[in-house]
Amino acid sequence: MDQSSRYANLNLKEKDLIAGGRHVLCAYIVKPKAGFGDFLQTAAHFAAESSTGTNVEVSTTDDFTRGVDALVYEIDESKELMKIAYPVELFDRNVIDGRAMIASFLTLTIGNNQGMGDVEYAKMYDFYVPPAYLKLFDGPSTTIKDLWRVLGRPVVDGGFIVGTIIKPKLGLRPQPFANACFDFWLGGDFIKNDEPQGNQVFAPFKETVRAVNEAMRRAQDATGQAKLFSFNITADDHYEMLARGEYILETFGENADHIAFLVDGYVAGPAAVTTARRAFPKQYLHYHRAGHGAVTSPQSKRGYTAFVLSKMARLQGASGIHTGTMGFGKMEGEAADRAMAFMITEDSADGPYFHQEWLGMNPTTPIISGGMNALRMPGFFTNLGHSNLIMTAGGGAFGHLDGGAAGAKSLRQAEQCWKLGADPVQFAKEHHEFARAFESFSHDADKLFPGWRGQLGLAA
């Protein structure tokens, strides 16, 4: 059935929709399936299925219903581009406080339309949230400024937080795990649980929490510097998340503000993120996106992009989210990921299709991880343009020939090298841990800095 007469209006202008302030706008790349309708017909069916319609006309539709139809307002078949305007009235709101929810946004904009028989593929690349609706989202309650404050740094441009993920990600018992934490903290700032770590039979949660607490206290005494840890509290059960969080805060006592809470936001979903955001508003909310590649990967033509995921995370209240390495690490990514970092940190930013004003909503910190080491960092910082972020290097720290503490120091020295605008090989001559990173990650060194061995006086 051709629904374009109802669910499409190509005379609508985007600037007028934005000025009106009552529509969420979404941009998709879409391809109709062969043998069905043309591009506009498929787009209109997509809008119908995403809002007030179905595959047939129904007798219960009235004039009010038609007033909240989602409308296709722009198409470009040559680019497979479709833009849809969703009236904000369509989206569910909390009974308890009238706040907005990402679960409803996803259900409409990327829900049943992903399984439509006449759509070969459809993927969301950007979305725009109008001011009145944006204000209904929680947004972050804490930011990187809170971590800088704990670390004793300036709360403006406090700089690089040197972090790690204890490796191996699974298989360490509580005390060896805590020992690795202590080792890294002798040179670094921040440690996170890897996303599967929790309450395994060989590493009971409470025993691990107590051991890490002791390691943090010893490291702080040894260095005279504050240390940070991000504990995974992800669970299927809301009450399990609360129990984990409360036990951690009770155990760490006066060091509670040194603790972030990690939530596997993609696999556990918006409900888990919001549980952590609302139950523990004083803690830094660390959004891990494990599993997101199933829909965000450039190889996937369905779902939504990592850019969209990160923008949703800011709305939900993530203090920080993993944003990839812009092609500098081992995970999928590209230099264009820079736009993602700007979208979640700035108060006014351009996405692939829409400009977004955040109206003072707290920023979300980019958390960089996945195959990074000290040699890759100067180029990464140059591409991003600043170093106000958290990086969690697992192999990049513990793969250092001299151990985790030296690995952490090499990462910090990499930032110093970039800030000075120094040549990395020349800088290495006067910074031992950074120099040893060349030997530790020689494959990267050969690729990034040909001839480094001779310059550092090492045999080829």
Swiss-Prot record:
Keywords: Calvin cycle, Carbon dioxide fixation, Lyase, Magnesium, Metal-binding, Monooxygenase, Oxidoreductase, Photosynthesis. Its cofactor is Mg(2+). It catalyses: 2 (2R)-3-phosphoglycerate + 2 H(+) = D-ribulose 1,5-bisphosphate + CO2 + H2O; D-ribulose 1,5-bisphosphate + O2 = 2-phosphoglycolate + (2R)-3-phosphoglycerate + 2 H(+). One of its GO terms (molecular function) is monooxygenase activity. PROSITE patterns: RUBISCO_LARGE. The record marks K330 as: Transition state stabilizer. PANTHER family: RIBULOSE BISPHOSPHATE CARBOXYLASE (PTHR42704), RIBULOSE BISPHOSPHATE CARBOXYLASE LARGE CHAIN (PTHR42704:SF17). This is Ribulose bisphosphate carboxylase. It comes from Rhodopseudomonas palustris (strain BisA53).
